[in-house]
From Swiss-Prot:
SUPFAM superfamilies: Cytochrome c. This is Cytochrome c-550-like protein. It is found in: Cellular thylakoid membrane. Keywords: Electron transport, Heme, Iron, Membrane, Metal-binding, Photosynthesis, Photosystem II, Signal, Thylakoid, Transport. The lineage of its organism: Bacteria, Bacillati, Cyanobacteriota, Cyanophyceae, Oscillatoriophycideae. Binds 1 heme c group covalently per subunit. GO terms for molecular function: electron transfer activity; heme binding; iron ion binding. Residues 1-30 form the signal peptide.
Length: 165
């Protein structure tokens, strides 16, 4: 009786170990947000303009989804759909990002803005946009937010539009 009980425990332990090895060692695929799938055309990594020279940096759908999620947690109160509730004439559209001083239509400049926000003409700091310090978010997190904003400005319908009718 004791040997049979011991054998059953041994077999169950082996089965659990095999199950853990099989299921826990397979790569975990990060969830891709449905908005990113539907509107940002990011099934394969997409090149986001890195600097004014036009160099590109690739971002996966997972990176953009993480950027969207972080944007939703921290920026959405003022920037629903790429709008700007504090200053409606300055949205997050690609046109408005290009028109800022300095332009914010590339990853490096938009990250610099998020780290040290200035008003649209660049003449002074803004108190309305939260400064994202390195203690708060990593460089990759801020780049994912910026990549999400830039890709949405390129691809998402009605992103940053002043009047949707």
């Amino acid at each position: 009786m004791l040997n049979k009980s011991l054998l059953i425990r041994f077999v169950l332990t082996i089965l659990i170990i095999v199950q853990v090895i099989i299921f826990d060692t397979q790569p975990v695929q990060a969830a891709v947000d449905s908005y990113v799938k539907r509107y940002l055309d990011a099934e394969i990594p997409v090149g986001i303009k890195l600097n004014k020279q036009g160099e590109l940096k690739n971002f996966s759908a997972e990176d953009l989804s993480e950027g969207k999620q972080t944007f939703a947690k921290n920026c959405l109160n003022c920037h629903v759909g790429g709008a700007n509730l504090v200053n409606p004439s300055v949205s997050l559209s690609l046109e408005k990002l290009k028109g800022a001083t300095p332009p914010r239509d590339d990853l490096n400049n938009l990250v610099a803005f998020l780290r040290d926000p200035m008003i649209y003409d660049g003449s002074s700091y803004t108190l309305f946009c939260r400064q994202i310090t390195e203690n708060w978010m990593s460089q990759q997190e801020v780049e994912n937010i910026a990549a999400f904003i830039l890709r949405a400005a390129q691809k998402a319908p009605y992103w940053g539009v002043e009047n949707v009718r």
